[in-house]
């Protein structure tokens, strides 16, 4: 979700940075919709992050070019942050046809499910699948 993207952009040499790199040029296929892209854009352009429109635009263009766009069906779900619901909805929609994970730095914000994982857990899953 958004915190992984922000963490990656603030510190590329990090586990979230590795996740983003794998999403841009590796085995991770981002699952998005336009609401998620707009959330990324709004958050990344906050002045405190010091990211330019060009940097954010290029990043989102690159993510979009590798992504699967899923039309999320609304779920009756209450989460601590209402803006997180769309990430869960898109994940659930894509899970109907593919093995899909929701990667977040805030596990406590989502239902406890085997497919809701931290960036570290996602890296472990990828490494184990490559063996």
Mark where each language-model region is.
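Metal-dependent nucleic-acid phosphoesterase active-site entry motif
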Residues: 1-13
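Alpha-helix capping/helix-boundary segments
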Residues: 4-5, 36, 87, 108-109
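PIN/NYN-family metal-dependent endoribonuclease catalytic core
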Residues: 15-45
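Membrane interface segments of multi-pass transport proteins and intramembrane proteases
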Residues: 49-50
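Active-site neighborhoods of divalent-metal-dependent phosphate/nucleic-acid chemistry enzymes
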Residues: 59-105
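Acidic, PIN/NYN-like endoribonuclease modules and their adjacent C-terminal/linker elements
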Residues: 96-131
């Amino acid at each position: 979700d958004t915190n992984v993207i922000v963490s990656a952009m603030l510190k590329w040499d990090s586990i979230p940075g590795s996740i983003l790199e794998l999403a841009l040029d590796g085995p991770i296929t981002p699952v998005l919709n336009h609401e998620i892209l707009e959330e990324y854009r709004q958050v990344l352009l906050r002045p405190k992050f010091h990211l330019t429109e060009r940097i954010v635009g290029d990043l989102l263009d690159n993510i979009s070019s590798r992504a699967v766009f899923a039309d999320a069906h609304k779920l009756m779900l209450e989460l601590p942050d209402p803006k997180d619901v769309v990430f869960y909805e898109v994940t659930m929609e894509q899970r109907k046809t593919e093995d899909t994970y929701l990667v977040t730095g805030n596990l406590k914000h989502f239902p406890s499910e085997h497919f809701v994982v931290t960036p570290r857990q996602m890296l472990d899953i990828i490494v184990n699948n490559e063996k």
